[in-house]
Amino acid sequence: VMLIAALESALGSDGGLSAVEGFMSSARFMQYMAGTTGLAFNFSDARETTQSFPAMFWYASKLGDPSLLWNEKIFLTREDTHFTAEEERFLPIILIYGSRFDMKEVTPPVSKIWTGHGKVPVALIRTGWDKGEGFYVGIKGGTASANHAHMDAGSFVFEAQGVRWAQDLGMQEYYSLEKEGVRLWNGDQDGQRWLSLIHI
């Protein structure tokens, strides 16, 4: 996003980068990944924690769609909001592009369903956008050979009335196994990586 903004500012064009298939729709995907509990759909290597995405302000400006800022508005007004040092470096994006919006007028998205039909298909469905209310379902398909998918051909989460009732077991840090001498990257039939599945 920052490269595209810099190219547009300096050269008047991003050279077609923002027109790459799926790039502009990735903002809506990120928005839908947060459930009504405030937790993220944590498939593959993803954690369930959510955070602010300052790039959403650029997307909202570029697409002329302030509803993309709905989750940002909630996140930035929470009392327990904090940023890591890595996240803090992107906060100026909020100042630059956020000045184009009146956050009091940001409304939730109208749509309640998002689907992605790629190699790893994803469907995200909700009954509303207010935290702690309604239902949220995230479903992921795919293949066991997809990168970072943990041999998982599918996953889902289900939330109702502010409670996550079902979810993927989540990721395990690679180091926790590697420090025990497990050779995770050996995909042979008799490789040690498969032993980790037996000891769950």
Map each language-model feature to its residues.
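Carbohydrate-active enzyme catalytic cores, enriched for enzymes
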Residues: 2-166
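A short, polar/charged loop-to-alpha-helix boundary motif
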Residues: 174-183
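Canonical bilayer-spanning transmembrane alpha-helix
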Residues: 184-188
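Membrane-proximal cytosolic segments adjacent to transmembrane helices
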Residues: 190-192
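Conserved small/polar residues in nucleotide/adenosyl-binding loops
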Residues: 198-200
